[in-house]
Amino acid sequence: MYLLDTNVVSELRKPRPHGAVVAWIEGIPDADLYLCAVTLGEIQADIEITREQNALKAAELEAWAEQLAASYNVLPMDAAIFRLWAKLMHRQSDTIYEDAMIAACAQKHKLTVVTRNVGDFAHFQVPLFNPFKN
């Protein structure tokens, strides 16, 4: 089972997404694909930045985010995950907050993180898969 990183779901929104990513995701049963609530938060943060400059584009992205939330199994950030996150963040840079949250969610639910940025997750000791390379 797989936890999709933000860069993977964002890739699928592109007019011409990477073929290997599309092929991989089409080959996985929907029931095996998960999002962490953090991913939806990252997307919403980008929508709010976009809204300041282009309300129409932000509305389009908002509709896409709603579709994402309805289409995937979304895992909440609960107390156990936040405790794992705190362990992962001990003596780490503040720049990896979101990645550490996604990694903690993956650890708790025993999921493989699917990301283009495997290096960002390498020290979290979670299984990783880069669909852009296949």
Locate each region found by the language model:
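Histidine- and aromatic-rich ligand-binding microenvironments
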Residues: 5, 36, 95-96, 117
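Residues at the C-termini of beta-strands that transition into short coil/loop
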Residues: 37-38, 78, 117, 132
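Residues that scaffold the ATP/ADP-binding catalytic core of kinase and kinase-like folds
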Residues: 11-12, 24, 46, 84-85, ...
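Short, well-structured N-terminal submotif of metal-dependent ribonuclease cores
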Residues: 1-35, 49-63, 134
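Acidic, PIN/NYN-like endoribonuclease modules and their adjacent C-terminal/linker elements
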Residues: 1, 103, 108-134
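Short loop->beta-strand "edge-of-pocket" segments that line small-molecule binding or catalytic clefts
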Residues: 2, 29-34, 68-75, 112
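A generic structural signal for short hydrophobic patches within well-formed alpha-helices
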Residues: 9, 40-43, 82, 121
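Active-site neighborhoods of divalent-metal-dependent phosphate/nucleic-acid chemistry enzymes
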Residues: 45-48, 71-116
